[in-house]
Amino acid sequence: MTSDRIVASDPIPTGGAGAGLSSGRALHLLLRMSDAGAVARHRDVAQRAGAVWWPRYGARRRRPTRRELVLQRQLADGVETWVYLLDGHAAHRARLEEIVFDPDGVDPARLAAGFDPARPVWGLFLLRGFDETTRHALVDGLVLDSAPVPGGLRKSLRGSQATLYVRHLEPPGPGPAR
């Protein structure tokens, strides 16, 4: 990656991360936040401006992680990628369209109230199409990428904030033929 953006037109590293990935096993993000109004503020901007930049504050890294390269591959390949959002007990999902690692140059009309440009940002996610879901559906339908066992996500959601890489839990295959 040579720029501070991950978009469909970026050159993709050959082999490795994300090669041959199907949408059913795609990598997604789950963001848990303590600000109970964050989703509503961002959803309102997305409805007005078509999409919204969702910031994740923290120290910026010099090189993309393996998982960021997977997300880059997915976006470039047109794989539907989701960001799941938990604030309190409310749960939503939105389509991920772009990742930016430098907030300079993003459209300020697509930033929600409360964005603090003085705080370090390790990434902004361009989100579109907010849908409501349930916490139960997320806990039962997603697994951590780092430990893909059913129910393993529940422990990771105990804190007030988290950025988790998740995948959809594959339904059990058909039973033996009779």
Q: Would you name each region that the model predicts?
A:
Residues 89-177:
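Aromatic- and Lys/Arg-enriched surface recognition patch
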Residues 29-31, 83, 125-127:
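Hydrophobic beta-strand residues in large extracellular and virion-surface proteins
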Residues 79-87:
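Short conserved beta-strand and strand-loop elements enriched in small hydrophobics
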Residues 53-54, 82, 122:
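A residue-identity detector for tryptophan
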